[in-house]
Amino acid sequence: MILGSLSRAGPLPLLRQPPIMQPPMDLKQILPFPLEPAPTLGLFSNYSTMDPVQKAVLSHTFGGPLLKTKRPVISCNVCQIRFNSQSQAEAHYKGNRHARRVKGIEAAKTRGREPSVRESGDPAPAGSIPPSGDGVAPRPVSMENGLGPAPGSPEKQPGSPSPPSVPESGQGVTKGEGGTSVPASLPGGSKEEEEKAKRLLYCALCKVAVNSLSQLEAHNKGTKHKTILEARSGLGPIKAYPRLGPPTPGEPEAPAQDRTFHCEICNVKVNSEVQLKQHISSRRHRDGVAGKPNPLLSRHKKPRGAAELAGTLTFSKELPKSLAGGLLPSPLAVAAVMAAAAGSPLSLRPAPAAPLLQGPPITHPLLHPAPGPIRTAHGPILFSPY
């Protein structure tokens, strides 16, 4: 009973007591390695001496997630081109294509800014020449030597004076440094025209656009530019004439598009400046300037060799001898004719002359007299085979 009571009373207090919660075990103390992914690589003692491929595999397996570095975008906003490397971008920025695009954008901005500047300022009086600068309104650009507006430009300012014509005597053109033709001081805005030509890099005389000032200077020193300039002024071998006859003294000189040009070197006449430029660029004119013979004239003339010339001389020397031997009778024939004439009864008759041409004798049937009452006797037949 006592044991039973003890056994009954013993477990009851144990059941009545609340269970004691044990603190959780620290996993870091149990595990021999930490859970962080990066220090996991420290387990490999020879990690620093491993192959790069093995390092990459271990880093990918045990390491943290690799952050993908965003590739920088290299592009040109002007030309709308994307590059793969910085070297490609640098090569593109140094090229002519990028430079032309940038220059075109700057020129467009300048043209768009010029009208606004002109409208904001005071209106220029009629007939006045605007100063050279960024606020100049666009108009046909003249060439560097200041010979007036470009040929073929129909628009002219109503108040601006007409460009002065270049005299034929060449007083308006002087020689400058380097042998280039530089115009003398002309009334008007010649300096402004030169500045415009240099700023816009355009030759209105030849209608040529260049990329730099050095190219423009080289073009102005070229043969084509000088030839067209001399043709306009009439100082070179190419002369300019009015198309409808000589101008009157009071009228101004006709423009270039209303004149004809004559090239004294090639003896060619053209009707416009466009045809003149084509002729100057042709091979015929270049060969004529260089002193070469005209290929059109010498195309059908073949040079005669020394053998042909010697054969011609030999033939000309032997020709009189052969003709004399064929036309003149031989001495034996003359002697036979004289002997036959002396032995014949009709010795008083003059002996017939020997035949000029040595050949077969005349056949017998041709020597019969003509039929009729009158029959003339003929002399003896010499050298007859019958």
From Swiss-Prot:
Zinc fingers typed Matrin-type, residue spans: 74-98, 201-225, 261-285
Pfam families hit by this protein: zf-met
Residues that bear Phosphothreonine: T248
Keyword vocabulary terms for this entry: Cell cycle, Cell projection, Cytoplasm, DNA damage, Metal-binding, Nucleus, Phosphoprotein, Repeat, RNA-binding, Transcription, Transcription regulation, Translation regulation, Ubl conjugation, Zinc, Zinc-finger
Chief site of localization: cytoplasm
GO molecular function, one term: p53 binding
Post-translational modification: Ubiquitinated upon prolonged exposure to genotoxic stress, which leads to proteasomal degradation of ZNF385A and releases p53/TP53 from cell-cycle arrest target gene promoters.
One GO term of the biological process aspect: mRNA localization resulting in post-transcriptional regulation of gene expression
Protein task: RNA-binding protein that affects the localization and the translation of a subset of mRNA. May play a role in adipogenesis through binding to the 3'-UTR of CEBPA mRNA and regulation of its translation. Targets ITPR1 mRNA to dendrites in Purkinje cells, and may regulate its activity-dependent translation. With ELAVL1, binds the 3'-UTR of p53/TP53 mRNAs to control their nuclear export induced by CDKN2A. Hence, may regulate p53/TP53 expression and mediate in part the CDKN2A anti-proliferative activity. May also bind CCNB1 mRNA.
Name of the protein described by the UniProt record: Zinc finger protein 385A
